[in-house]
């Protein structure tokens, strides 16, 4: 459940279209996965990719990343573009948006099942099967436990939300009372 910056989404779309055109989507996805791990490592060190790129060391960051992770030419040139446009800070969001582009292209929707306790795999599969038939797409569901909903479930995917929780029912009831009185 990420709220992404429009700049990140735009860059991800551009990268995805080029990867499709060159038929290297899986390689670019693999490169971005490696870069994501590198960014996580930097975050633990309280550093950012942008900061390292600005350092006046003799090493070229993009060449280092390319040789260390074996990046393909598209990913390498894309990183150079981000560096040139001072957009390296968006890389983690671009990776998330790129993954969303790939899932959409493959006909996969990511969803969240919010419940008060962890559901069994078979119960999740039942919900998943119902919504896959409704959406006519493959659905990947993550079960999130949130005791604040009191009871029931909330299912979120794309821009949709089915709130069948007790808290949701109480809030809808409150709204109706306020409208009528």
Swiss-Prot record:
Gene (UniProt): atpH
Organism classification: Bacteria, Pseudomonadati, Pseudomonadota, Alphaproteobacteria, Rickettsiales
Family annotation (InterPro entries): ATP_synth_OSCP/delta_N_sf (IPR026015), ATPase_OSCP/d_CS (IPR020781), ATPase_OSCP/dsu (IPR000711)
Molecular-function annotations in GO: proton-transporting ATP synthase activity, rotational mechanism
The species this protein was found in: Orientia tsutsugamushi (strain Boryong) (Rickettsia tsutsugamushi)
Oligomer and partners: F-type ATPases have 2 components, F(1) - the catalytic core - and F(0) - the membrane proton channel. F(1) has five subunits: alpha(3), beta(3), gamma(1), delta(1), epsilon(1). F(0) has three main subunits: a(1), b(2) and c(10-14). The alpha and beta chains form an alternating ring which encloses part of the gamma chain. F(1) is attached to F(0) by a central stalk formed by the gamma and epsilon chains, while a peripheral stalk is formed by the delta and b chains.
Function of the protein: F(1)F(0) ATP synthase produces ATP from ADP in the presence of a proton or sodium gradient. F-type ATPases consist of two structural domains, F(1) containing the extramembraneous catalytic core and F(0) containing the membrane proton channel, linked together by a central stalk and a peripheral stalk. During catalysis, ATP synthesis in the catalytic domain of F(1) is coupled via a rotary mechanism of the central stalk subunits to proton translocation. This protein is part of the stalk that links CF(0) to CF(1). It either transmits conformational changes from CF(0) to CF(1) or is implicated in proton conduction.
Gene3D superfamilies per record: N-terminal domain of the delta subunit of the F1F0-ATP synthase
Subcellular location: Cell inner membrane
Record carries keyword Transmembrane: no
Pfam families: OSCP
Record's protein name: ATP synthase subunit delta
Signal peptide from the UniProt entry: none
Sequence similarity: Belongs to the ATPase delta chain family.
GO annotation, cellular component aspect: plasma membrane; proton-transporting ATP synthase complex
Record key words, sorted: ATP synthesis, Cell inner membrane, Cell membrane, CF(1), Hydrogen ion transport, Ion transport, Membrane, Transport
Topology in the lipid bilayer: Peripheral membrane protein
Membrane in keyword set: yes
């Amino acid at each position: 459940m990420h709220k992404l910056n429009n700049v990140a989404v735009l860059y991800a779309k551009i990268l995805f279209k080029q990867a499709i055109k060159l038929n290297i989507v899986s390689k670019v996805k693999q490169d971005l996965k490696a870069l994501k791990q590198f960014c996580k490592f930097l975050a633990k060190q309280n550093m950012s990719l942008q900061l390292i790129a600005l350092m006046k060391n003799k090493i070229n960051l993009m060449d280092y990343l390319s040789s260390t992770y074996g990046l393909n030419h598209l990913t390498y040139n894309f990183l150079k573009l981000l560096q040139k446009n001072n957009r390296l800070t968006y890389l983690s969001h671009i990776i998330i948006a790129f993954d969303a582009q790939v899932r959409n292209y493959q006909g996969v929707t990511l969803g969240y099942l919010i419940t008060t306790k962890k559901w069994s795999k078979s119960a999740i599969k039942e919900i998943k099967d119902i919504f896959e038939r409704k959406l006519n797409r493959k659905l990947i569901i993550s079960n999130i436990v949130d005791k604040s909903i009191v009871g029931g479930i909330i299912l979120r995917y794309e821009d949709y939300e089915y709130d069948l929780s007790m808290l949701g029912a109480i809030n809808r009831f409150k709204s109706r009372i306020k409208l009528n009185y």
